Amino acid sequence: MSEDAIGQQVPAAQEAAAGAEPNSAARERHATLSRELTEHQYRYYVLDAPTISDAAFDEQLRELAALEAEFPALRTPDSPTQRVGGAFSTDFTPVAHAERMMSLDNAFSDEELAAWAERVERDAGGPVPYLCELKVDGLAINLTYERGRLVRAATRGDGRTGEDVTANVRSIQDVPGELTPSAEFPEIPDLLEVRGEIYFPVAGFADLNAGLVEQGRAPFANPRNAAAGSLRQKDPRITASRPLRLVVHGFGARRGWAPSTQSESYAALRTWGLPTSDRWRVVPGLAGVAEYVAHYAAHRHDVEHEIDGVVVKVDPVAIQGRLGSTSRAPRWAIAFKYPPEEVNTRLLDIDVNVGRTGRVTPFAVLEPVRVAGSTVALATLHNAREVERKGVLIGDTVVIRKAGDVIPEVLGPVVELRPPEARSFVMPSRCPCCGTPLAPAKEGDIDIRCPNTRSCPAQLRERVFHLAGRGAFDIEVLGYKGAAALLDAEIITDEGDLFTLDTAQLARSPFFVNKDGSLGSNAVKLLENLTVAKERELWRVLVALSIRHVGPTAAQALARHFRSVEAIDQAGEEELSAVDGVGPTIAASVREWFAVAWHREVVRKWAEAGVRMAEEAVAQGPRPLEGVTVVVTGTLAGYSRDQAAEAIQSRGGKVTGSVSKKTAFVVVGDNPGTKAEKAAGLKVPVLDEEGFQVLLDAGPEAARAVARVEG
């Protein structure tokens, strides 16, 4: 449930029917929705234990708002559509806000956002600048400062009266007990209500739940619940022990201070010692708003806290005053809500999957549910310890998250809905595919593995599928089904047999044969693909070997340095470790891999079949980027990520995934992530794609001349 999920956009056609008299069905539905929504608000605001997702709550609330728009007689002051938050009895002392804490109306589509902006600009008399900021999914808080000293902290409550949580808020490191005048803003207001959001960092959420489970206590379903539950503790020491953070995003009552714009107020609040976000932007019109919304839709998980949308505000305070407010929300601000990425569903079972390196991973079998544009029936649980840390039982209602193309993940259980028959997951002791006893690869490993690496059908199928991928041999027709077909027909014993396949062997599998018994086009294409794959670059061969920890970057470093599989095989661990981009872990993994006899047999078979096992001898070309470290972020029109990395590395440069003071350049394409922002903060030179080409063609000095340094 979102704290500002109430003021929905109501279609004009429904407003036109404002005089309609409600029938019995409408009254009954309105009563049911009001009762259910009130219960959900109580569970959300007071118990910190909601039993439905934000998306489900928003959907019910929109239905109620539509009913009241069609039948105004049903709308009453105590309707969930008219309440800002939860006016419920709690154990905390009630305290009145000097100025009401209002909520926000929502926009769920570009059209609704555009309609809001059109009304704003019509009523304002022309275009206005907008301030865009992230909508933090946390707990709303009101901090009252008198003559610069914190005297009270209160939750939102019903907007007029909240709960006094001053003692707990004082324990949060981000909250200053006293404001400090600055040169730019030397006068601290006599009275200042600061509005903000207390959140639980995503990075600490799993550890908190693990600790609660170890203590035999119920875990939180998500970071927002963790923030609310941590703040509303009777013992402030518990609050102090948890890594709660604050971000401020506005003000209420004030005396002795009149900022001209919202953005000016943020600058003042920051200089006085209050933590404002560094991600807000002022844009001149709706196009800028749309760009900001799109950017964080793609990068919402680059942020340290959970977000569920973007808040858009008219920046000039004078225009805010002219636009005014409804009974519950300002007309000068709106929350654009992203499609939900978290939903509740039932955990039907927990099964395990065996990967290409033998790792046995538990996964959740779910009651199918629609989230983030697709239907999800499976979600990762990582390992047995993670299942225990999350505190999920088979039969639980669980919160799942799906973010874009990321594998769906189980966040935690809704303990309040746990059925009596719920049961714990027990990790199998034997491989479900080949029956081999499972064990950690070495003492202390979290993961358990099937040691039957050569013959386990699951591992072999995954390895064949992997080596056919775009990052390895790029064998187009050898997908998951094709890999399984080769194994099912016992055409190959291991991946070493792949490059000696012929038509007679493929004809043994129904997958590669037409109904009339002739060889299928996929078989012909596979043999053609295999011929082409034999000439792939050495680094792709190394990736295809499924050596643990050796991905494209490490494989390219090894290929560039040693130039043949034989040289890599003969190199010692210390020599391998010294290669830039390799290091001790990868070096040890390479040595372990080549120490296995059947691994070396795969290499021998591929070499005899004509697979390229060495780079062609070439004269050492110029290395203009020797010693230059480059970070690439976003999408480039002329280069894939791998191609950009290869272009840098072939000229002697180094590609890393994080920005630091040692970074020479950050290359920024479309939809860059937080790396671009970090580059600005560290004043690292930034290149667009045209500048990147200058770097490749003319070297670092020429690139510095066309780079921009922000911050």
Swiss-Prot record:
Residues 1-29 are annotated as: Disordered. Its EC number is 6.5.1.2. Keywords: DNA damage, DNA repair, DNA replication, Ligase, Magnesium, Manganese, Metal-binding, NAD, Zinc. NAD(+) binds at D54, A55, A56, F57, D58, S103, L104, E133, R156, E197, K313, K337. The active site is at K135. GO terms for biological process: DNA repair; DNA replication. CDD domains: BRCT_DNA_ligase_like, LIGANc. GO terms for cellular component: cytosol. Residues 12-25 have a biased composition (Low complexity). It catalyses: NAD(+) + (deoxyribonucleotide)n-3'-hydroxyl + 5'-phospho-(deoxyribonucleotide)m = (deoxyribonucleotide)n+m + AMP + beta-nicotinamide D-nucleotide. PROSITE patterns: BRCT, DNA_LIGASE_N1, DNA_LIGASE_N2. Signal peptide: none annotated. SUPFAM superfamilies: BRCT domain (SSF52113), DNA ligase/mRNA capping enzyme, catalytic domain (SSF56091), Nucleic acid-binding proteins (SSF50249), RuvA domain 2-like (SSF47781). Zn(2+) binds at C431, C434, C450, C456. Its cofactor is Mg(2+); Mn(2+). Residues 620-709 form the BRCT domain. Pfam families: BRCT (PF00533), DNA_ligase_aden (PF01653), DNA_ligase_OB (PF03120), DNA_ligase_ZBD (PF03119), HHH_2 (PF12826), Nlig-Ia (PF22745). The keyword Transmembrane helix does not apply. It is an enzyme of class 6 (ligase). DNA ligase that catalyzes the formation of phosphodiester linkages between 5'-phosphoryl and 3'-hydroxyl groups in double-stranded DNA using NAD as a coenzyme and as the energy source for the reaction. It is essential for DNA replication and repair of damaged DNA. PANTHER family: CHROMOSOME TRANSMISSION FIDELITY FACTOR 18, DNA LIGASE. Belongs to the NAD-dependent DNA ligase family. LigA subfamily. This is DNA ligase. It comes from Salinispora tropica (strain ATCC BAA-916 / DSM 44818 / JCM 13857 / NBRC 105044 / CNB-440). The lineage of its organism: Bacteria, Bacillati, Actinomycetota, Actinomycetes, Micromonosporales.
